[in-house]
Design a protein with these regions (language model features):
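SDR active-site lid
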Residues: 171-248
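Active-site helix of classical SDR
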Residues: 119, 155
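The beta1-alpha1 cofactor-binding region of Rossmann-like NAD(H)/NADP(H)-dependent oxidoreductases
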Residues: 58-69, 101
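Conserved glycine-rich cofactor-binding loop
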Residues: 12-14
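A glycine-rich helix->loop->beta "capping" turn
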Residues: 52, 73-84, 92
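Residue(s) in the substrate-gating loop at a strand-loop-helix junction
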Residues: 139
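Substrate-binding pocket helix/loop in short-chain dehydrogenase/reductase
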Residues: 95-96, 100-105
Length: 285
């Protein structure tokens, strides 16, 4: 049996980093990609320490040429890509009134278009081989809109809809599986970077929004801090468990907290399988 090949974006730290290690420990050959190779040392050392088959490559999901070059290089070495994990992304908290057009486009370009570009690049080989699994990292913010996160949530709602639509016809026709992962708070550089960005920019300066923003920041620290959120390794384990399922769910919450937080949106169809079957009827099947 040939070794399975996994491609992960945003693997320099946090969830991508931990998922790369776990999959390699399971016997996968992992192509762990990142925008900035200056950040590769920690993953490189961890792979060497554990004698894991991890190949680190440069890939920027906001640049088509970068994606095409990386995927082309991989497919010169491998027959196909078995698993794609679209993990690269960033948080952003700002009111619509205060966000610049450049900031809004940056979020869409990274969090949503990055997923679409990567899927477009990898799906052809999966379809040709009639097998594969594409994992898109979303958030509870892809199901429930949250204060000061409307721009971030809009990108994650987009990831949810994109995944759901592909699962409705590509999966049953070509045996390419799709799952969207919906964590709550993760103790990672993602959260740390968001908090640092908020603090460095002074948060929300508008007097009318300021009291609301201060309350939000208190809740953010409470819900996303140690003890009330998951570690990157815990969420990575959920991802690996999902990949190993014969018939994986379309939607995957990663904790009891995320299940509870999204229950009003998900309780009628927790796995997304019922909706997948319903939408499939649009194909006349």
């Amino acid at each position: 049996m040939n070794k399975k090949i996994a491609l992960i974006t945003g693997a320099s730290s946090g969830l991508g980093f931990e998922t790369a290690l776990l999959l390699a420990e399971k016997g996968y050959k992992v192509y762990a990609t990142m925008r900035n190779l200056d950040k590769q040392d920690a993953l490189k050392q961890a792979a060497e320490d554990k004698n894991l088959n991890i190949v680190i490559k440069e890939l920027d999901v906001t640049k088509v040429n970068s994606i095409e070059n990386a995927v082309s290089d991989i497919l010169k070495e491998e027959e196909t890509i078995d698993v794609l994990i679209n993990n690269a992304g960033a948080g952003f908290a700002r009111t619509t009134e205060h966000a610049t057009d450049e900031e809004m486009m940056w979020q869409v370009n990274l969090n949503l278009m990055g997923v679409m570009r990567m899927t477009k690049a990898v799906l052809p080989t999966m379809r040709t081989h009639r097998q594969g699994h594409i994992i898109n990292i979303s958030s509870v913010g892809g199901l429930v809109g949250q204060p000061f996160n409307e721009i971030y949530c809009a990108t994650k709602f987009g990831v949810e809809g994109y995944t759901e639509a592909l699962a409705s016809y590509v999966q049953p026709e070509f045996n390419v599986k799709f799952s969207v992962i919906e964590p709550g708070g993760i103790q990672s550089e993602f959260t740390n970077n968001l908090m640092a960005h908020l603090e460095s920019t002074g948060g929300i300066q508008d007097d009318e929004y300021l009291p609301l923003f201060q309350s939000y920041m208190g809740g953010l620290k409470e819900n996303y801090g140690p003890g009330s959120s998951q570690t990157s390794a815990e969420v990575a384990q959920v991802i690996v468990d999902t990949i190993e399922k014969e018939d994986p769910p379309v939607r995957v919450r990663t904790s009891a907290w995320s299940e509870d937080f999204t229950r009003l949106k998900t309780e009628a169809d927790p796995t997304g399988k019922l909706l997948q079957a319903q939408v499939k009827k649009l194909l006349g099947k």
